[in-house]
From Swiss-Prot:
Pathway: tRNA modification; N(7)-methylguanine-tRNA biosynthesis. It holds the Pfam family WD40. The lineage of its organism: Eukaryota, Metazoa, Ecdysozoa, Arthropoda, Hexapoda. It comes from Drosophila ananassae (Fruit fly). Belongs to the WD repeat TRM82 family. This is tRNA (guanine-N(7)-)-methyltransferase non-catalytic subunit wuho.
């Protein structure tokens, strides 16, 4: 998975085992992070005895195979390295930009915490994850970070006691796609594949404060607007604004296609926002909406800008906004591709220096390397029409009974 986001003044791009921090104005490289192929070399410990036992069994099998086939030692080593090689899943900055969190997937699932500076980043801890992460979010003061996984569990990791064990806070029955933590740290807001938005009290996370219900498909993204309001995007082709304290829907805006990514920028505090949505399988790649609050709970979409982003010609997976540009990542000719478009015109940005994309791909060690993006079609619910089959069988049974009576 390729992750990309803008944290002023840095454009952050993560892929494989590398994260690049780029100045979006002059596109110069601030710093970079490279993870080792084996996280055990930088402090990763086995999560539990069961996992350790499995790891020992794998080592025994590898050793036995090596003893039987000494001529294939190099091949066995390569296979082992491939089995444990990690890949970056999520990257997130703390609000003050002092900490950086990275989660990995692949052979070793872990949370890596860094102390970040403009020119470098220093590794603080490496903690194992039970499952692959799906979302990542720091609290407002950066003292802890929330990690959700593919099974719907949400864990809190301490960023002061960096080696402390995680605390299980809450759980969903399906994968959590996004998570918010309010600035006052009183509420944790999560959304999942089962079209639910849940508002949970903190620290008493056994107490659910409210639900924001109305979406008919997966809720792909959330963003805080004010102390009481959030915006959500969904696969049901809607963008909605909520008063999450009351669990009340305030605005529903129809989209031309399912929304799979959401980005929000504040233009005027608690009043005007730029809301960008990445569409799934649509002729337009990205739409940018101007969301305005007139008073209280009154919200409206007042303008729309479309960035086609050559949709349909390549597999778009992620995007971010950087003021006057939209940066989009995806797969083109089965390789990772990064493209920049001007928000105003929606066309390919002419101000991006020639060769910049190649430089970034080279820095990510992704140039010419096969890239398989996430299959977003699995996010949609699988529906089975059992009623039609039942009615058809019932109809045939009645017809057979009538024929028997006539006979």
């Amino acid at each position: 998975m390729a992750t990309i986001f803008f944290a002023d003044p840095e454009l952050v791009i993560g892929h494989g085992r590398r994260v690049l921090f780029v100045n979006p104005d002059d596109l110069q490289l601030f710093k970079e992070i490279e993870l080792p192929p084996d996280l055990a070399t930088c402090g990763l410990k086995v999560a539990d005895s069961k996992e350790q036992h499995c790891q020992h069994e794998q080592q025994d099998v590898a050793a036995a195979g090596s003893a039987k086939q000494s001529s294939n030692t190099a091949s066995a080593s390569a296979s082992k390295a491939k089995a444990i090689e990690v890949s970056i899943q999520n990257v997130s900055y703390s609000p003050d930009r002092q900490l950086l969190a990275i989660t990995t997937t692949g052979g070793q699932k872990a949370l890596l915490l860094y102390r970040s500076r403009m020119e470098h980043a220093r590794l603080l801890s490496v903690r194992p994850l039970a499952r692959a992460s799906s979302a990542l979010r720091f609290c407002s003061d950066g003292s802890s970070v929330l990690v959700t996984d593919k099974t719907g569990d949400c864990y809190q990791y301490d960023c002061v006691e960096v080696e402390a064990a995680p605390r299980l806070l809450l759980g969903h029955l399906s994968v959590v796609f996004d998570i918010l933590w309010t600035d006052d740290q009183q509420h944790i807001i999560t959304c999942d594949r089962d079209d639910k938005i849940r508002v949970t009290n903190y620290p008493a996370t056994f107490d659910i404060h409210s639900y924001c219900l109305g979406h008919k498909e997966f809720v792909s993204g959330l963003a805080l607007l004010t102390e009481q309001h959030i915006v959500s995007s969904s696969g049901d082709k809607t963008l909605r604004v909520w008063n999450f304290i009351e669990g009340k829907e305030l605005l529903i805006h129809q989209l031309p296609a399912p929304a799979v990514r959401l980005q929000v920028q504040q233009l005027e505090p608690e009043k005007v926002y730029q809301v960008a949505v990445l569409f799934y399988d649509h002729v337009d790649g990205v739409a940018i909406y101007r969301l305005e609050r007139s008073s209280g709970d009154n919200w409206a979409i007042t303008a729309t800008t479309v960035v086609r982003a050559d949709a349909g010609l390549w597999n778009i997976c992620n995007f971010t906004l950087t003021g006057n540009r939209v940066y989009v990542t995806g797969a083109e000719n089965e390789c990772l591709a990064i493209k920049a478009y001007d928000i105003g015109s929606g066309e390919t940005s002419t101000s991006v220096p020639d060769g910049w994309v190649k430089m970034v791909l080279r820095g990510l060690e992704a140039e010419g390397v096969a890239y398989l993006p996430e299959d977003l079609s699995v996010w949609f619910k699988k529906r089975f029409d059992n009623v039609s089959d039942y009615l058809e069988r019932k109809k045939r049974r009645i017809e057979e009974q009538q024929q028997q009576k006539c006979g």
